[in-house]
């Protein structure tokens, strides 16, 4: 089988960076972020969060190859807002939303156990 070992899908190699940022010179105020050891789950969540931001003109991601465990995220923003700021704000907002979701989920589970349903 040609599939790489399973651990390669989540362990960073020595010296490998989790996120690599490069400026996109083809369009103004754009950047390309390569996120290693992640897949559609995180890529789609970040893209959707970015699209909620009115200063983000474009946000899209792709997986270069099914056997490569990374996604490439392209972000273009308005001139007064950098792609890096948009990326960081999207991640911060996602963390807040997921924390709230976790809290509500735990409360619902607690109510379910106490209710005896």
UniProtKB/Swiss-Prot annotation:
Transmembrane segments: none annotated. GO terms for biological process: transcription by RNA polymerase II. Keywords: DNA-directed RNA polymerase, Nucleus, Transcription. It holds the Pfam family RNA_pol_L_2. Gene3D superfamilies: RNA polymerase, RBP11-like subunit. GO terms for molecular function: DNA binding; DNA-directed RNA polymerase activity; protein dimerization activity. One of its GO terms (cellular component) is RNA polymerase II, core complex. Its main location: nucleus. It is found in: Nucleus. Disulfide bonds: none annotated. Component of the RNA polymerase II (Pol II) complex consisting of 12 subunits. DNA-dependent RNA polymerase catalyzes the transcription of DNA into RNA using the four ribonucleoside triphosphates as substrates. Component of RNA polymerase II which synthesizes mRNA precursors and many functional non-coding RNAs. Pol II is the central component of the basal RNA polymerase II transcription machinery. It is composed of mobile elements that move relative to each other. RPB11 is part of the core element with the central large cleft. Belongs to the archaeal Rpo11/eukaryotic RPB11/RPC19 RNA polymerase subunit family. PANTHER family: DNA-DIRECTED RNA POLYMERASE I,II,III (PTHR13946), DNA-DIRECTED RNA POLYMERASE II SUBUNIT RPB11 (PTHR13946:SF16). This is DNA-directed RNA polymerase II subunit RPB11. It comes from Anopheles gambiae.
């Amino acid at each position: 089988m040609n599939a790489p070992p399973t651990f390669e899908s989540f362990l960073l190699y020595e010296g490998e960076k989790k996120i690599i940022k490069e400026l996109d010179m083809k369009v103004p105020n754009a950047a390309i972020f390569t996120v290693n050891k992640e897949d559609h789950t995180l890529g789609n969540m970040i893209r959707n969060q970015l699209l909620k931001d009115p200063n983000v003109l474009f946000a899209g991601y792709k997986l270069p190859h099914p056997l490569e465990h990374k996604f490439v995220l392209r972000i273009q923003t308005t001139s007064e807002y950098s792609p890096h700021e948009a990326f960081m704000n999207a991640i911060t907002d996602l963390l807040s939303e997921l924390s709230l979701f976790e809290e509500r989920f735990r409360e619902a589970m607690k109510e379910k156990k106490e209710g005896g349903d």
